[in-house]
């Protein structure tokens, strides 16, 4: 073939590939997903810094304590993740329906819930911590470090939960810049304070907790300033905000109930990994903390696509536009599938080097290498359930999300029966089964709705 013809065919092939993988829907998805990916990865980046900073102290007890404390915090706060999820779905639907009064309601009502729940957690933190550490069990030295971490960390509860609402609302109105500023500035501040308080002032686990508390309240202030700006842009008046606490509160509570039950099952499964890992020894819990940081980093990055799907799915639901919904879904599958595969390749080729950066403890590095294969498998298994979560959140189909999570949790529990034979591998196998079942069950429900034409039916 003459060189000129070869170049022509190559150029045509590249254009066809770009047309297939970068349609207008793909570009619209990336417009919202890309800033969310970059802002999202600052969240696990904070976890990476926590792990790296604490992991370079002179004992694995500190790392284990932060792992237990972070898991308890995640379990409790993520039970209230419905504050962000329901806010995003309802806000996106109001945005699609072009209803400013509904937009005001989807901000004020969940914000009141968040501040009330956060205040209760801060006031009652000591008995809740006692209960959490009693359930976890394990090394007394690790539990003591976890207690020191949590006594300070949970003072941030009102701000942390309010920030979930602000993030959900900003995402729902598709103002991509605001969530980026909210997450990036807050988490960078957290990272800087983390290094200074832990390494500079030698505050150990208390320093890591205090850094997060300061950063959460700073983020809340920034978020409120951003929301104030966007209220003006969206034509939402002060009178609308004053009356926004009224009306449809029962629907919000019912929606949040189902999402909270879903979140409870999710956190029970992830909490089981820490609890059962702690009973396998201090080294195992430290190893799993390092590996879970990698998984969290991947999940948050891929959640950038899920967040974009939430916003577009909710907008399409509010406008009753099935064509837009299907275009966004196909674009999300293409783009997030490629990114998930890239994560798997990176962990396959450079996983050992990444672990070495996170901890200088040789025994932890060597032990972590045995379980690295799960970090290669999990991105390509988990990406589909993240995307489908976005579809269902946007449509506020919380009951079906709850039922899907129940199926996945049952599969997780059954897989744990292999623990006496597989040891720590059983924990990671159970997590893989859990993510796979979430994706498969949601896909089956989505397929049924699409065939029957019932996706846009009232929820």
Curated annotation (Swiss-Prot):
Induction: By DNA damage. The keyword Cell membrane applies. Its main location: membrane. It is a multi-pass membrane protein. InterPro entries: DinF-like, MATE_fam. It is found in: Cell inner membrane. One of its GO terms (cellular component) is plasma membrane. The chain crosses the membrane at residues 2-22, 29-49, 63-83, 111-131, 154-174, 180-200, 207-227, 265-285, 289-309, 338-358, 373-393, 416-436. The keyword Transport does not apply. It holds the Pfam family MatE. Keywords: Cell inner membrane, Cell membrane, Membrane, Transmembrane, Transmembrane helix. One of its GO terms (molecular function) is antiporter activity. Belongs to the multi antimicrobial extrusion (MATE) (TC 2.A.66.1) family. PANTHER family: PROTEIN DETOXIFICATION 44, CHLOROPLASTIC (PTHR42893:SF46), PROTEIN DETOXIFICATION 44, CHLOROPLASTIC-RELATED (PTHR42893). NCBIfam families: matE (TIGR00797), PRK10367.1 (NF007690). This is DNA damage-inducible protein F.
């Amino acid at each position: 073939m003459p060189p000129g013809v070869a170049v022509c065919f190559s150029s045509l092939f590249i254009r066809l590939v770009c047309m297939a993988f970068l349609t207008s829907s793909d570009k619209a998805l990336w417009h919202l997903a890309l800033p969310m990916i970059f802002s999202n990865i600052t969240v696990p980046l904070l976890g990476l810094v926590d792990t790296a900073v604490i992991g370079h102290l002179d004992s694995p007890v500190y790392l284990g304590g932060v792992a237990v404390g972070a898991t308890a915090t995640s379990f409790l706060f993520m039970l209230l993740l419905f504050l962000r999820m329901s806010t995003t779905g309802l806000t996106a639907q109001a945005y699609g329906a072009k209803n400013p009064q509904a937009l005001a309601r989807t901000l004020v009502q969940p914000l009141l819930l968040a501040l009330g729940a956060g205040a209760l957690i801060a006031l009652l933190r000591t008995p809740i911590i006692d209960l959490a550490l009693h359930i976890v069990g394990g090394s007394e030295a690790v539990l003591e470090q976890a207690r020191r971490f949590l006594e300070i960390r949970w003072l941030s509860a009102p701000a942390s939960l309010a920030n979930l609402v602000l993030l959900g609302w900003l995402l729902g109105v598709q103002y991509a810049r605001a969530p980026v500023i909210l997450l990036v500035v807050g988490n960078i501040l957290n990272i800087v304070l983390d290094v200074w308080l832990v390494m500079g002032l030698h505050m150990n686990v208390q320093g890591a907790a205090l850094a997060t508390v300061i950063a959460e309240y700073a983020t809340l202030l920034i978020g409120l300033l951003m929301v104030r700006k966007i209220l003006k842009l969206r034509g939402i008046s002060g009178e609308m905000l004053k009356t926004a606490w009224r009306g449809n509160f029962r629907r919000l509570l019912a929606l949040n109930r189902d999402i909270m039950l879903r979140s409870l099952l999710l956190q029970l499964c992830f909490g089981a990994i820490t609890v059962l890992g702690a009973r396998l020894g201090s080294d195992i819990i430290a190893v799993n903390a390092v590996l879970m940081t990698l998984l969290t980093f991947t999940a948050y990055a891929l959640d950038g696509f899920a967040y974009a799907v939430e916003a577009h799915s909710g907008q399409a639901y509010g406008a009753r536009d099935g064509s837009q919904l299907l275009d966004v879904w196909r674009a999300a599958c293409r783009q997030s599938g490629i990114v998930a595969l890239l994560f798997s390749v990176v962990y396959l080729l450079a996983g050992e080097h990444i672990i070495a950066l996170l901890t200088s403890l040789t025994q932890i590095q060597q032990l972590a290498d045995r379980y690295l294969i799960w970090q290669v498998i999990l991105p390509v298994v988990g990406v589909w359930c993240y995307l489908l979560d976005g579809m269902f959140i946007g449509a506020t189909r919380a009951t079906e999300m709850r039922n899907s999570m129940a199926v996945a949790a049952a599969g997780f529990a059954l897989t744990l029966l292999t623990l006496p034979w597989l040891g720590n591998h059983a924990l990671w196998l159970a997590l893989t089964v859990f993510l796979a079942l979430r994706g498969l069950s949601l896909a089956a429900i989505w397929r049924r709705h699409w065939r029957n034409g019932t996706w846009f039916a009232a929820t």
